[in-house]
Each structure stands twice: as structure tokens, then as C-alpha cells.
Amino acid sequence: MDTQGFSCLLLLISEIDLSVKRRI
């Protein structure tokens, strides 16, 4: 498992989650 890719994916998910919360 690629830890660097996993952390990057987590960062992307958290950023999308923030944008979704801002829209609502």
C-alpha cells in the first residue's frame, strides 16, 4: 500500500468534505 498516495487521497476527501459543508 502506498502511504503517500493514501495521504493524498485523504487530503482530497477532506477538502471535498469541507466544500460540501460550505455549500450547505
Curated annotation (Swiss-Prot):
Molecular function GO terms recorded: receptor antagonist activity
Any one GO cellular component localisation term in the record: extracellular region
Where's it found, cell-wise?
Secreted; Cytoplasm
Q: What coarse category fits the chief subcellular location reported for this protein? A: secreted
Record keywords, A-Z: Cytoplasm, Secreted
Q: Kindly give the CDD domains that the UniProt entry links to this protein.
A: humanin
Source superkingdom = Eukaryota
Q: Where is the signal peptide?
A: none
Give one GO biological process term.
Answer: negative regulation of execution phase of apoptosis
Q: Which PANTHER family match?
A: HUMANIN-LIKE 13, HUMANIN-LIKE 4
Its function?
Answer: Plays a role as a neuroprotective and antiapoptotic factor.
Q: Which family does it belong to?
A: Belongs to the humanin family.
- Protein name per UniProt: Humanin-like 13
